[in-house]
């Protein structure tokens, strides 16, 4: 039997990132998934990450503010040392993900306040980062094993949208009709892909995160 240094159970974002990072460090890794689809609940999520003090954060953001917020909302359930470590080094995560081909951004800034806005250290926006869409065709046949988004996260239960698009369409804010037409044209105009599947070639939200991580593994 081949020697394995690390066994990772589950192919969600946490599992895939753990496997990739262990491989980066020179360890032999095996990732196990019980389902016939990969991605877990991460694939069905919004795919966003909470990164305090990132390049697009509110000007008053800081590691100290983030730690104060985390200590308040976790109510002692997480050791302070772990919270402090997260507040300090999580800002490195977007760059690491970008090196894997998974790109995050804040758009538009200051529109996603922290869940507990009255808590000490809360930010009015900028800490929640969205994942950029990706072309599902680069996954080859593995595209069809990627766990699908929930129907309510898609237009007509099948057309992918990202978080800024969803906000714009829901609020019918400036330019929403043009955005809707562009999304429809991208989906219905892709005749070659439509002959293969009803699923959108454009991956967004958690599907984009998981698809990008799978591509990074060479899978």
What are these regions (language model features)?
Residues 1-3:
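A short, basic/flexible loop-to-alpha-helix module at the beginning of a structural domain
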Residues 5-31:
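N-terminal Rossmann-like FAD-binding beta1-loop-alpha1 element of flavoenzymes
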Residues 34-219:
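Conserved N-terminal/central alpha/beta ligand/cofactor-binding core
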């Amino acid at each position: 039997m081949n020697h394995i240094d690390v066994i990772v159970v589950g192919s969600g974002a946490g599992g895939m990132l753990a496997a990739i990072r262990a491989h980066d460090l020179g360890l032999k890794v095996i990732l196990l998934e019980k389902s016939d689809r990969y991605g877990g609940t991460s694939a069905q999520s919004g795919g966003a990450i909470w990164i305090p003090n990132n390049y697009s954060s509110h000007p008053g953001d800081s590691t100290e503010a983030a730690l104060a917020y985390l200590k308040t909302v976790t109510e002692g359930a997480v050791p302070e040392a772990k919270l402090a470590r997260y507040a300090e080094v999580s800002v490195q995560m977007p760059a690491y993900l970008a090196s894997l081909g998974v790109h995050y951004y804040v758009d538009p800034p200051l529109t996603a306040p922290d869940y507990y806005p009255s808590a000490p250290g809360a930010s009015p926006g900028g800490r929640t980062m969205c994942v950029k869409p990706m072309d599902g065709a680069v996954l080859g046949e593995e595209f069809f094993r990627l766990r699908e988004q929930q129907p309510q996260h898609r237009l007509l239960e099948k057309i992918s949208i990202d978080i800024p698009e969803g906000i714009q369409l829901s609020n019918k804010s400036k330019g929403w009709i043009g955005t809707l037409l562009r999304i429809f044209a991208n989906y219905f105009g892709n005749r070659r892909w439509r002959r293969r599947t009803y699923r959108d070639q454009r991956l967004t939200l958690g599907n984009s995160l998981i698809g990008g991580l799978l591509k990074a593994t060479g899978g």
